[in-house]
Amino acid sequence: DADFNIVESASSGFVSLNLSDDIDNDEGYRLVVGKNGVEIYGKTEKGVFYGIQTLIQMLPSNIYEKSNSSLVSSVVIPSLLIDDAPRFSYRGMMLDVSRTFFDKEYMLKFIDALAYYKVNTLHWHLADDQGWRVEIKKYPKLTEQGAWRGAGEVLNPAYGSGNERNGGYYSQDDVREIVQYAAERNITIIPEIDLPGHSKAVAVTYPEILCDINTI
């Protein structure tokens, strides 16, 4: 995150963000670097956002450093013109948090990385045999028990999780925050609950959902 001063008239070295009907693709952009500064044009805010990502990719990596000794005081970008638009409207990544759980803080960083590479869809695999990861208030045992693996847990250790209690889940507020955070970065989240297949985490916490073999 960064803070920017918004001004009505620009001086040398400014970055100007503009909406333009001259851009054909809703996610396309034009990036112009000239002697007076940087201009980014997009047909929509999405296009402008992707133009900003390209500009960021031109900057040295130590702009992300938190140490004052590593901070960049100035950056010189050569004059250039980039007209860019996505070839594919769906640019997705799938993250399986059932088999390997990643907490909310990791998810937010992961979403930042997706935005950096202009990925616009996150397929979020929230439930499988190895863990249930989203809070359902009507069925609390899904996360009280079904979100944890280890010796003595209802789910056995798997995928290198070890014998100690391992796992976690997202509260409903966590999910809302993650979805909003992604939307602000032009990323749509597709949540996946793997049912009725791969439903061990449900079956061991609420066995009453299982079919009675004698009635089949």
PLM region descriptions:
Residues 42, 92-104, 157-172:
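The substrate-binding groove and active-site-proximal loops of carbohydrate-active enzymes
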Residues 86, 130-184, 199-216:
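Aromatic- and acidic-residue-enriched carbohydrate-binding clefts of CAZyme catalytic domains
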Residues 48, 107, 171, 175:
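Aromatic/hydrophobic pocket-lining residues that form the small-molecule binding cavity
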Residues 110, 178, 189:
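Aromatic/hydrophobic pocket-lining residues that form π-stacking "cages" and hydrophobic walls in ligand
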Residues 1-88:
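Contiguous, structured surface segment used for ligand recognition
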Residues 88-91, 118-120, 183-187:
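Short, well-ordered coil/turn segments that N-cap beta-strands
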